[in-house]
From Swiss-Prot:
It holds the Pfam family Gamma_PGA_hydro. This is UPF0714 protein YjqB. The gene is yjqB. Belongs to the UPF0714 family. It comes from Bacillus subtilis (strain 168). It comes from the Bacteria. InterPro entries: Gamma_PGA_hydro, Gamma_PGA_hydro_sf.
Amino acid sequence: MEDMYDSFAALSASESEYRIIYEEKNGSELIVLGPHGGRIEPGVSELVRAFSDRCSIYLFEGLKQRNNRSLHLTSIRFDEPLALEKVNDHHYALAFHGYYDPKIPHTLVGGADRKKAKLICERLNEAGFSAELTNEKDRLAGVHPNNIVNRTKREMGLQLEVSTAQRNALFRNFGCRDKSYIQNDLFDRYVEAVKLGFYT
């Protein structure tokens, strides 16, 4: 599906029901971000926040009652100024995204940092999760230099595309619109597996 806007400037001129969250982890070279958080891609914000123990975090969250899809800016177009500044301040970046597949719990691991992507994929598999390293030519590979996650000091980052079914499996009440999602044991196991790869 095409984005409604082609830049953050265009989006912010027409939309107001969103919020931007940035929490600095002093001295950390790591940042974890969710450019499609809140109601844009449900479950992404919770995953990002789970990394605040050792990472700076950035979230762009949709807050609309409906049609949060209009707040979606594809990662290579995601040029929100604070995100650009803060990702560029860090050496390592990991972005969580959600893709639509309500049947198969799965994670597509990509980004220009292929070495760490392979490591995260292996750690997820070892923890019992279905995950695969994206082909660099795949639509969701996340290797484009303009992708927000690759705009680090090292000019590379990591992108995790998590299916609807996998996100659903990580919470007791996924899809409940008016309540905070309650994380389950699987959530903790998933996050721990990603951390083992990312923090190495």
